[in-house]
């Protein structure tokens, strides 16, 4: 295998780059450039002068490997020079400043010095070589004019577009060797002459056009290039093999088999491209090459890529799949009968399988067959298709006989030896008593093929002397199976009967067959079979899914248990019912009857319109539909078979009437009838629903590469139906507004799909059966489990085109939910496709006491409760959603019926048991001002099942949210509230109703939070920026390492980004310089931006001004979530945008909640006056003096740092409230006792102590519990951990004495090592205190204090009072040192990277110390007034410069947090 791969290296793998500079006289390159297009050669390197001498310059290799003399020169500083003259190549080299980058390749058999040779080779369109040929031609046409023998067309100028010459002149040029290319196109000769060594003085300088090609019109070049590209070359040839390389110049595979296939074609030179062949697969690319030269662009989110061998393939970023098929060619695909011999239709693939031989895969319809589709189509065309289905059936029936003497044709006798793989042929027929059994396929290298006497279409007359005319399919199968391996069987065959046409079966040309395992069909793309094998028997798998036992109905393979092979129902020994054939005609609204499951098959449950189904009676069991046995098909499959018939079609039904139906014999009867026909074909890949009994394990005999793997996949896909669930079939007709429901989920292969909101007055609501939170199992019979959100939307789009859809949903039945006996307000639709009334409804135990609570809120308030959701899978019988907090004074509190610990099982009557946290948020948001909660009291909750399927909100099919969710992770000890085993950490989403109107695009906020990968196609726009003196003027957040996308974090003032006007904070970056950003790291994003040089091309999706926090997706994120539906006041008019997502890591007790709510309103009037509009454009001078926002959001007590205790809000210190700015605002200096807020701490589980990002984004920087720094003190001491900026800025000097850099580093290192502990809150020092500095003794105490708080679990609940001053001093030292450490400013344009995935490419101008002091003094009086109003008896400070001693307050150490991976509890200074 490795040798094969090694042989397929493309010449591209030999390309090397180096940077060189010259030392010598100006203009002397120190290297010799030879060749040139005027000589018919590539530019190539001559001698490199590496030693001075002879007065010439020398060539010095700066980086990379030095090229060798003779190497072909491809590019100079990224500019292609192939096709240029020697003069122009030298001019390009001299144009660039040293050092210059050279891209060279060693000459080989594909690329060498001969330019004419390379242009004569034939390459696959779109390949690297084909593109290089186009580049060569473009360069040639800058200085030469192609010639042609055709007459000028309108608008063409001789000597400009073409040189129009006679045929004699053309041949003379060709014989003289003056043409680099020559050929014919549309009956005319075309040629490309060698260019002159010197350009014409009347032409533009070709070098300028090469270097600045964007400024020149290339339309005329393209016209000529197209003509030359399509012409049939006179000296056309395939490229010779490189040493140890196949002909990768064509497509990188060079299979001998495929090379021969194209050698005969001469109609178009492009046809001779061989097909792709790898690991016994071949994909025909000639159809690909036949397309027009100028194809339309690829569909959205598609990308063309190349393999290592240069072969192109296509990437669908919507579905995360790759394909060799060009999606643009599906509209131009030829019909199979129009394809040439050896050519496959578009979408077909040939498989050479060692086990099954050669067969063909139709990727478009997802089916397989043994017969070549082209040969099949041509055969059908020859015999004609004009006869109707019924006429053909009548003719075939007329020919049937049980008397061998009456057979027409030639009798052939064969003796076959059974091998371990069977007899090597497949059979069809025997599904009716009057149908022949015929050979369908003779498998390659099988016993039948080796014998050479059997042929497709042969009728099996007798087996070992036993006449089998009139025998059923299963009878014959069993006879073959009874033959031991290595034993012979004597067959008598009759040759002279054609195989029945596939179109006789109504489903042939529409769908693929789907193998069935355990009575259930496999997923789309996992198993396929040919529609030609419609009547084949089935492969039997053992219980382990092994495929060693193949029924003789398909492969006539080894023996299997006889009890698995049954005869038809008529011969199984059961009572013989009456078989009746009833002709039906499909009416405009269907067949006029409804069907339902029964133990013996699909039963007619109701006659809806007798005029279309005369003779049909209620209770009839459907055995065959249009001669297709449907006994083994499930309800959905039978429904789909009926649906596919057009209106007015005559459809005969074979029904079973009068037979007993014994439920006790259900399993046996199903098994008995399973093998009467191997017909497992379904419509549009329908998927049966789980049956209430395990049928025999059968599957199609269609070849599959790994049956065991397919079985395991299908077993996972169709595992037994969970308990306490029921499945419903809902048939909906499309209205003008659609089907009337939303779709949730599909975020990954293990994510389920759910029904979202039901649209009022829509089709789903009118039908009445569909509910939000129902799990979607199938769409029109196609299973959706494991499919992506985009694929589900595609299925719904297809259904919308059809005008109707059949949905199979699974509904969780949890205790306390009222379930009607029959979910069918509309008993049956009139489409002939009624839904199934299933009998296997789960039995219900004694229900728990549940009750509905209706909450109504005002427009300016929330509902006031917190939902906790366990993200780890709860134990059986546990509802994962519960009330975690009820906010005092809120609607939830006023109601009086919600208590902490109560479980929520439904919202507005819709089960939320299996919904994710985000989807519950959306449901409640959609509820408006009134919501109904179904509550199970905590003490009574013991039984409802739970689910942890995380469903993602559909970005395209989502209600417009009424407000924005705001995420705040609040680790804390929740065991007391939750009463649930497990480690639950809370992530709260505050539902802001009033903030909604301040957001420009509320919908996209939800999309960005959810991280929908399918939203990339929504409203993206490109922006190209040129680098300014300090970069591009924006900073990034996110990356793969932070489990989030890339977002615009900040825009620099006067930077290129903000000047452009189209980029805004919060916009998501979809592509950087053409490369998608999905899944790339932050570092890679920076590299992509740098790689663009002075320009960067961004593809952006508009945001709302909020930046998702990587903490929301952090791998250390808590394992449970809570939602706060609470009031949030509107932001200040000066704020950039409403903050929608915030993050904190502090628990809050009920006591603190009350205090916050009671004192926030009084505080708001004072604080809002002092708040200053924050900037999101990266204006560093303003940011330097911005204080960190208050810790606790208004009416959001969950954001205050520190464990809840009675003294939490002593004085005014606890009444920190969240500002309404999108980024931190300036704050006035406060009393020293006031600065007791906590430094944000990294998660405890993070070994490196990475803290969660505290950015300046609208959703960040608020309520983080960060240190409040007075205006003149410079930057936040914890800025690095908070990730406020990636670009360090120069700080103001803090006093006359400062700590050394060593001390600063030590202090910062200590704070970083405290990965999971709460750094004790550093107080804001008065200016005098700051000037005094910090002694080394204090520094040591600082480290001691940090070590003592490193492990919250080990901390004592009591603290030694003597250690408090030391700890406080250590925090002061930490803050001052951090400020000094951050005082160093990098060079212009330097980019710094913090731990939170942010980088800044611009730095801003620092403010002077005097300006900072002036600003601080301007706030002095306001600080004084505010300090007087503070509660708690704190000493006053009338001036920010006044020295005030630091009085250590009582310290409260939180109890150990039991939650794994949670940040330690923050301490609070009072």
From Swiss-Prot:
Alphabetical keyword list: ATP-binding, Cell junction, Cell membrane, Membrane, Nucleotide-binding, Nucleus, Phosphoprotein, Repeat, Tight junction
Subcellular localization(s) per the UniProt record: Cell membrane; Cell junction, Tight junction; Nucleus
Gene Ontology molecular function: ATP binding; frizzled binding; protein phosphatase binding
Biased composition (Pro residues): 193-204
InterPro entries registered for this protein in UniProt: GK/Ca_channel_bsu (IPR008145), Guanylate_kin-like_dom (IPR008144), Guanylate_kinase_CS (IPR020590), P-loop_NTPase (IPR027417), PDZ (IPR001478), PDZ_sf (IPR036034), WW_dom (IPR001202), WW_dom_sf (IPR036020)
Biased composition (Basic and acidic residues): 1193-1209, 1230-1263, 1326-1340, 1350-1361, 1377-1397, 1422-1431
Membrane topology designation: Peripheral membrane protein
Region Interaction with PTEN: start-end pairs: 413-495
An individual GO BP term: signal transduction
A Pfam family it matches: WW
Matching Gene3D superfamilies: 2.20.70.10, 2.30.42.10, Guanylate Kinase phosphate binding domain
Protein function: Acts as a scaffolding protein at cell-cell junctions, thereby regulating various cellular and signaling processes. Cooperates with PTEN to modulate the kinase activity of AKT1. Its interaction with PTPRB and tyrosine phosphorylated proteins suggests that it may link receptor tyrosine phosphatase with its substrates at the plasma membrane. In polarized epithelial cells, involved in efficient trafficking of TGFA to the cell surface. Regulates the ability of LPAR2 to activate ERK and RhoA pathways. Regulates the JNK signaling cascade via its interaction with FZD4 and VANGL2.
The protein's name: Membrane-associated guanylate kinase, WW and PDZ domain-containing protein 3
